């Protein structure tokens, strides 16, 4: 597998299919988000009133939630450009600055609120979750609603993720995402129980929003999963562009089936990976039944072709900037 660092992968997939669709909603279940950051100016963000949202301050949970949200919803030509800036974002905090961890009750509440507000995709970061092994009745009920609504749940595939818990709760449309470095090695390990249903993507040196208006570089499965949640939103937008009904469950299957084989270090590591735009195009073609060219679908790609009259580069650096 060709070595790709996270920042390169992040740039490769920017503005595929024009940046998404306002009718597609992606819920971010992580820490609170500092929506005053310049990258969110113009973003369609809807804060949800979860238990964790009432206890936010400028702490580690808010820093992580802000970085995660910017990877998806950061606006074009801002200091952080996200994968799906035109999609609608539902901010449903589950982690608090004043307390470590997330209870099953808080997780279930955030899922339910996200569904009430029309979420098509859930992104759930890893962290300290309640150690109780069996899912609660409330969490099982929330997951059942996700299954009924055909909602795709994208989770961190790291050891501290909640993918195993959600699987035991009955989740049928679950996509764990692990992070790999330039040499293809998993960053921070992975949940061996989920290796056969997930993918790995470059997750080192991902640039995102930080507190007090600055930017920072982070790495790990939480951030890699955010990129794939954004990509899933792009795929649903591509379906809409072709007059098809968005199908989150099918989008998850298309992501899995368009992955590149990965030479994993261990048998219980994820055997599939995404490394660039070619994977998005393959997934979109599988999902829509129509050959997809992300550059042709994007106004930024059309701009470059008009300016250069040359072969379109796949790299997102070739786009107009304000």
Segment roles from a protein language model:
Residues 30, 165-237, 241:
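Extracellular S/T/G-rich loop segment that most often corresponds to the catalytic His/Ser-adjacent loop
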Residues 1-25, 37-39, 300-309, 315-321:
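Protease zymogen maturation seam
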Residues 20, 144-148, 200:
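Anion (oxyanion) recognition and catalysis
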Residues 13-46, 56-104, 170-173, 183, ...:
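Subtilisin-like serine protease catalytic core
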Residues 115, 119-126, 173, 239-322:
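C-terminal subdomain of the subtilisin-like protease fold in secreted/lumenal serine endopeptidases
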Residues 32-35, 78, 95-98, 127-131, ...:
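Solvent-exposed loop/turn segments at secondary-structure junctions
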Residues 73-77, 112-120, 144-148, 179-182, ...:
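Sec-exported extracytoplasmic/periplasmic mature domains
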Residues 94-172, 214-225:
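Substrate-binding/access-modulating region of protease and related hydrolase catalytic domains
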């Amino acid at each position: 597998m060709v070595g790709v660092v996270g920042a390169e992968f992040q740039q490769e997939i920017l503005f595929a299919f024009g940046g998404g669709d306002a009718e597609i909603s992606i819920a971010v279940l992580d820490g609170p988000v500092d929506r005053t950051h310049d990258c969110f100016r113009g973003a369609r963000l809807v804060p949800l009133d979860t238990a964790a949202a009432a206890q936010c301050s400028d702490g580690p949970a808010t820093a992580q939630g802000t970085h995660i949200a910017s990877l998806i919803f950061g606006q074009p030509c801002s200091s952080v450009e996200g994968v799906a800036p035109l999609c609608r974002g539902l901010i449903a905090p589950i982690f608090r600055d004043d307390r470590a961890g997330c209870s099953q009750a808080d997780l279930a509440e955030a899922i339910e609120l996200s569904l009430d507000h029309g979420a098509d995709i859930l992104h759930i970061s890893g962290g300290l979750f309640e150690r109780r092994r069996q899912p609660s009745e409330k969490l099982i009920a929330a997951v059942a609603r996700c299954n009924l609504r055909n909602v795709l749940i994208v989770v961190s595939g790291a050891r501290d993720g909640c993918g195993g818990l959600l699987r035991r709760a009955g989740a049928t449309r679950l996509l764990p995402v692990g992070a790999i470095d330039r040499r293809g090695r998993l960053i921070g390990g992975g949940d061996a129980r989920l290796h056969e249903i997930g993918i790995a993507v470059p997750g080192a040196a991902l640039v995102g929003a930080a507190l007090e208006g600055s930017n920072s570089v982070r790495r790990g499965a939480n951030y890699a999963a955010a990129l794939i949640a954004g990509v899933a939103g792009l795929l649903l937008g591509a379906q809409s562009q072709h007059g098809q009904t968005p199908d989150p469950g099918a989008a998850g299957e298309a992501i899995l089936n368009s992955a590149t084989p990965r030479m994993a270090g261990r048998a219980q590591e994820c055997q599939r990976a995404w490394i660039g735009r070619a994977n998005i195009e393959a997934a979109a073609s599988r999902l829509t039944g129509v050959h997809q060219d992300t550059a042709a679908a994007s106004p930024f790609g059309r701009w470059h072709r008009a300016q250069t009259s040359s072969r379109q580069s796949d790299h997102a650096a070739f786009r107009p900037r304000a």
